A protein has these predicted regions:
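C-terminal motif of bacterial Sec signal peptides marking the signal peptidase cleavage site
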Residues: 19-20
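Alpha-to-beta junction loops
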Residues: 75-84, 156-158, 201-210
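Ligand-binding "clamshell"
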Residues: 93-103, 107-122, 202-204, 216-230
């Protein structure tokens, strides 16, 4: 692990201290976008700051919206790259059946994006930000729920606090209902991302949607329900880049591939704590993350 980290730091250091060899005079700025939640915004800010350190001009277009909105912006050419999750791309964008081998999933997504959209998936990070459902210790004991199978059966007695995408995405509630059966909740209410945890803590819900790198899980000692039938695939994050941007700025690949190994589960949980709980600005958290690792 230390050898890998040292090698990653060396690679990133060499990438980030490149002179302006990639910044062609008059080249259009690379437009870096993100989806509309703290983790994606923060990682996009890390990508943007790393590119700027390598003298690649950057324009930020953060907080665009859902997966569909970000992908539409890529297809129109409104943005040149953004962070995406392998499982989300496979199921929600490509509408393909889940794959549970993370490497096979990445290769499938990489090939399909190249063929369908003329977009390149760069190196994925080890962080796996899977979807999930969580509850409080009290509710888990009261209803005897520790797994998704338990929750599927108990759902008619439970109120769900969900982010808006969860009620419609194929890899979310509709998929759970089809795959596990059940999951017919007593009540479903949608909240802005992050506020589902507030509803859970205030007793306005019994179960909430979660991402496994969310800092609120540890802060509030929540119970993440085990995916005992293995519904969800891997959700490794990687930069998705329009081929036209790579042709204009080929050094993007080296810069962002050097970042990839540093985005581990623990590193991303720490970033999420800083941004989503301690309310740091994502750009500030990103700059501190890079400074800590290559200075």
């Amino acid at each position: 692990m230390n050898i890998t980290r040292a090698r990653s730091l060396a690679l990133m250091g060499s990438a980030l201290i490149l002179p302006s060899c990639g910044g062609k005079g008059g080249s259009r700025a690379v437009r870096v976008g993100s989806k509309n939640f703290g983790e994606d915004i923060t990682i996009a800010e890390i990508y943007a700051a790393a590119l700027e350190h390598s003298n690649i001009p950057v324009e930020r277009r953060m907080n665009l919206g859902s997966t569909q909105i970000a992908m539409a912006a890529m297809q129109r050419g409104d943005i040149d790259l953004y962070p995406e999750y392998t499982g989300t791309a496979l199921i929600d964008v490509l509408h393909m059946a889940p794959l549970h081998d993370a490497k096979q999933l990445y290769q499938r997504v990489r090939m399909q994006y190249q063929e369908r959209y003329g977009m390149t998936w760069l190196q994925p990070s080890p962080v796996n930000d899977s979807q999930g459902l969580c509850t409080t210790q009290t509710v888990a004991r009261k209803y005897g729920i520790r797994t998704l199978s338990d929750c599927a059966k108990a759902a008619p007695q439970l109120r769900l606090a969900a982010i808006p995408e969860f009620v419609a995405r194929a890899d979310a509630l509709p998929g759970l209902q089809k795959f596990y059966g059940g999951f017919r909740f007593k009540d479903v209410k949608t909240y802005e991302i992050g506020l589902q945890y507030t509803a859970l803590q205030h007793g306005d819900a019994d179960v909430a949607t979660a991402f496994t790198t969310d800092a609120q899980i540890a802060v509030n000692t929540l119970v993440v329900l085990r995916d005992d039938k293995h519904f969800w695939p891997a959700y490794n994050i990687a930069p998705v880049v329009r081929n036209a941007a790579l042709r204009a700025h080929p050094q993007i690949t080296g810069v962002l591939n050097a970042i990839a190994p540093l985005l581990t589960d623990s590193a991303v949980r720490r970033l999420n704590l800083q941004v989503n709980v301690q309310h740091q600005d994502p750009a500030d958290a990103a700059q501190a993350f890079l400074k800590e690792r290559y200075n």
